Amino acid sequence: MDVNPTLLFLKVPAQNAISTTFPYTGDPPYSHGTGTGYTMDTVNRTHQYSEKGRWTTNTETGAPQLNPIDGPLPEDNEPSGYAQTDCVLEAMAFLEESHPGLFENSCLETMEVVQQTRVDKLTQGRQTYDWTLNRNQPAATALANTIEVFRSNGLTANESGRLIDFLKDVMESMDKEEMEITTHFQRKRRVRDNMTKKMVTQRTIGKKKQRLTKKSYLIRALTLNTMTKDAERGKLKRRAIATPGMQIRGFVHFVEALARSICEKLEQSGLPVGGNEKKAKLANVVRKMMTNSQDTELSFTVTGDNTKWNENQNPRIFLAMITYITRNQPEWFRNVLSIAPIMFSNKMARLGKGYMFESKSMKLRTQIPAEMLANIDLKYFNESTRKKIEKIRPLLIEGTASLSPGMMMGMFNMLSTVLGVSILNLGQKRYTKTTYWWDGLQSSDDFALIVNAPNHEGIQAGVDRFYRTCKLVGINMSKKKSYINRTGTFEFTSFFYRYGFVANFSMELPSFGVSGINESADMSIGVTVIKNNMINNDLGPATAQMALQLFIKDYRYTYRCHRGDTQIQTRRSFELKKLWEQTRSKAGLLVSDGGPNLYNIRNLHIPEVCLKWELMDEDYQGRLCNPLNPFVSHKEVESVNNAVVMPAHGPARSMEYDAVATTHSWIPKRNRSILNTSQRGILEDEQMYQKCCTLFEKFFPSSSYRRPVGISSMMEAMVSRARIDARIDFESGRIKKEEFAEILKICSTIEELGRQGK
């Protein structure tokens, strides 16, 4: 079914077609090679924005540090990071004045969070800088490695304790004179294979102990590893993003918890909510400004863009904000929250993999690791790289660059939003004390500013004042990239507002199509995406029906499961035709077994197995959903699964879809090649760790479980919990006496094994 796209636009108002101009179809650009150049750009730019600051040297690490705070007031429109502490504190005070009790209540909520968060919170997240191996690892592994090293160095770390206890260990680790770590290395040797008599490379993994001095350990603890941000659309150049290590993460988590709690209570904040809730919040602010601009007032909106938000922010300003927000709180709480900004003031940026050189004539390739950049002869580099390296050299220590000013991407999204909102808050008439006033929306570095005034001069004056106020706290509104319009038409975080939010449908385009998980999940995700877009994104019935037909077509081509009565020949058609002929009720066959499609836009909410269950032959039902069938996935079946959907813009979203386990919900096995590398042990550790965590959560389903009193290990806690639960179930008649006895027997066996293991 081929569609002429111009037909889609016959009745569409122009503003709704804005979304088709976005660079969202097709594959996004990915980066190749190293991110070293991008990271050096970031470090050099950040220092350039703060160049008039004061230089100092960190006494512990010897790193040169630039502090632009309370630096010169800007004299031109160039971006700069010279925030004035007193201005920031005043903005905070006014924010509190217009929201009585805001900080107090948020602190109380956060204290609760700090008391209850468990260490396993840090296992969430993807790649994390693992300081023990000096490279990136999955979060769970990096945490396990950190805890293991802490233990072997006499710290009390335990992986089922509270996060706050782990953070105490982090603090203690920084006072130690040295830390002993275990590093992995590979030995390669050529040996002759007995069977084939060929020479093969045999790899063995060695572990060796290494001592880190206090200085080296501190550098690693303060290091952010850098990578190139992938899949960014609409940009010519790539840019670097950072991933911090386990020492920093926990502290950042608590600061962001406090800031999130504040943002939730601020009507101008576009975080932490999303989707329709965010749109409603924004529409409220716009409505307020439009109803207040009676016939006498003009109302204009700036679709704002800030220049290099992260690189002009400063951790010292965040420290000042936290000090103010928590000023009436207990000392321990203030200390915990102030550590993250202090660590960021002393952060080091790891320069990534380094540079790859190749000689065309000699067919040689060689890698220059980042550690060598400090003293390698620069004649090998081209001019632009040479300039970068020369500039960054004074900042290098042990292959990392000292980067005191600036924040790396995505670290303090919530707290920086609070700073932005505090400036928007100053637009009330009681603060501007003149005829113009402003309000707006802030979401991390994105903002929309609504200015009301009796005439155009007033609007201009209002925007100017906003611009200059921002400069005082290190926010640089870009005059080139921001534009102003009559209120009613603007864009904010890729939502387009035109007397109400217009669905930016093309943003969702990348999430249509076949995900490639397995036949069962893909069918479910595909129809759920269409259903969700009908609910949230103005996907009309005709277009949805068309999307559905295109999806089914795509699905059949992907899994080669064309209808049993089709003429199309594929590898599977012989088997599928045979099944088609043997089946009495052909409508009952799943699409992935060559059956017909019974979906239409009215029944997208029903999983396909349920939709066709009554129509299936009995023996087909038995094969499809029989738990004894070795092909039915045996992992525990949750009724809802989560898929990661990639919209074209913004973070990957988690989307729920109905999961019915059948022979089609297979899980592909992991690529075997990893099992022959140094990663193998790490992989096994990670799986063990994940299994233990999952098991523990099964026993203690509430997420804020307190530790069972007086119990030392996870295993004992689970056994004691199992006994209690079994007794309750037995006494209430939910399980029989034999089952109860069997559970107690298993518990005793586990305890016995545990004792032998000790």
Swiss-Prot record:
Signal sequence coordinates: none
The keyword Phosphoprotein appears for this protein: yes
Record-linked InterPro entries: RNA-dir_pol_NSvirus (IPR007099), RNA_pol_PB1_influenza (IPR001407)
A GO term, aspect molecular function: RNA-directed RNA polymerase activity
Catalytic activity: RNA(n) + a ribonucleoside 5'-triphosphate = RNA(n+1) + diphosphate
Region feature Promoter-binding site, mapped onto this chain: 249-256
Stretches for region Disordered: 53-82
GO cellular component: host cell cytoplasm; host cell nucleus
Xref: Pfam families: Flu_PB1
RdRp catalytic domain ranges (all copies): 286-483
EC code(s) of this entry: 2.7.7.48
UniProt subcellular location: Host nucleus; Host cytoplasm
Polar residues composition-biased segments: 55-64
Keywords: Eukaryotic host gene expression shutoff by virus, Eukaryotic host transcription shutoff by virus, Host cytoplasm, Host gene expression shutoff by virus, Host nucleus, Host-virus interaction, Inhibition of host RNA polymerase II by virus, Nucleotide-binding, Nucleotidyltransferase, Phosphoprotein, RNA-directed RNA polymerase, Transferase, Viral RNA replication, Viral transcription
Top EC class of this enzyme: transferase
PROSITE patterns, sorted: RDRP_SSRNA_NEG_SEG
Protein's GO biological process: DNA-templated transcription; symbiont-mediated suppression of host gene expression; symbiont-mediated suppression of host mRNA transcription via inhibition of RNA polymerase II activity; viral RNA genome replication; viral transcription
Motif (Nuclear localization signal): 187-195, 203-216
Keyword Nucleotidyltransferase applies: yes
Main location: host cell
PTM statement from Swiss-Prot or TrEMBL: Phosphorylated by host PRKCA.
Role according to the record: RNA-dependent RNA polymerase which is responsible for replication and transcription of virus RNA segments. The transcription of viral mRNAs occurs by a unique mechanism called cap-snatching. 5' methylated caps of cellular mRNAs are cleaved after 10-13 nucleotides by PA. In turn, these short capped RNAs are used as primers by PB1 for transcription of viral mRNAs. During virus replication, PB1 initiates RNA synthesis and copy vRNA into complementary RNA (cRNA) which in turn serves as a template for the production of more vRNAs.
HAMAP family: INFV_RDRP
UniProt similarity note: Belongs to the influenza viruses polymerase PB1 family.
Quaternary context: Influenza RNA polymerase is composed of three subunits: PB1, PB2 and PA. Interacts (via N-terminus) with PA (via C-terminus). Interacts (via C-terminus) with PB2 (via N-terminus); this interaction is essential for transcription initiation.
Name the UniProt record assigns to this protein: RNA-directed RNA polymerase catalytic subunit
Organism whose genome encodes this protein: Influenza A virus (strain A/Chicken/Hong Kong/220/1997 H5N1 genotype Gs/Gd)
Gene from which the chain derives: PB1
